Amino acid sequence: MGKVCKKSWIAAIFLGVMLFAAGFAFQASTVDAQAATTGFRTVKGKTYYYKNGKKVKGWLTLNRKKYFLNTRTGVLLKGWQRSSRGPKRYFNKKNGVMYTGMKKIGGKYYYFDIKTGYTKSGFVRSANGAVVRYFQPSNYTMAKGWLKNAKGQKWYFASDGKMYMGLKKIGKYYYYFNPSTGIAASGYVNTGNET
C-alpha cells in the first residue's frame, strides 16, 4: 500500500511538473505570437499596423517618421489627404510616410510644413534664410518665372523656384530685385555702387 501511495505521489509531482512546463510553453508561444504581430501587415490590399496583436489607429511615429491610420478602420493612409481646413497632406504611396519639406509629386513641387505636414502657400524661406520660394495659394505648387500681385508688384523665380534678388539677367535684359523682398524695381535704381 505504501508503494502504491508513493508511486501515486511521484506520478502527481511528475504530472504537475509537466503541466507547469506546458503552461510556460503556452505563455511563451503567446508572447512570441504577439511579438510576431507587431509591425505593418497587408491584408487584401490594405495595409495596417499592429502592436502586440492589436490594430493601431490614428497617428503613428516610427523612427522619427509619421504615419496616419484611419481612426475607424486602421487602414494606412496613402497619397493626398484633404483637410477640412483647406491645406492637404501627402503620404508616400508606397510606404505611407507623411511628407515634410519640399517634395516633388507628379512633376510639381510642393512644400509641406515640417511639424504638421500640411501644404504651405505663399512665400517660404529656407531654414538658413538664404532661399525664398513661392507656393501658389490656388494649388500649393511652386511658382516659376514671373509672378505679379494685385498691386502690380513683380517677382521672378528661377526654374528651381529660387526667388531672384539683386541684379539679374533674364533673357536679354537686366532687372534689379530688392535684396530683402525680391520685388522687381522699375526706373532708375541706386544700388550703392552704381545707378
Model-assigned labels for residue ranges:
Residues G2-T195:
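Extracellular adhesion/carbohydrate-binding repeat motifs centered on closely spaced tryptophans
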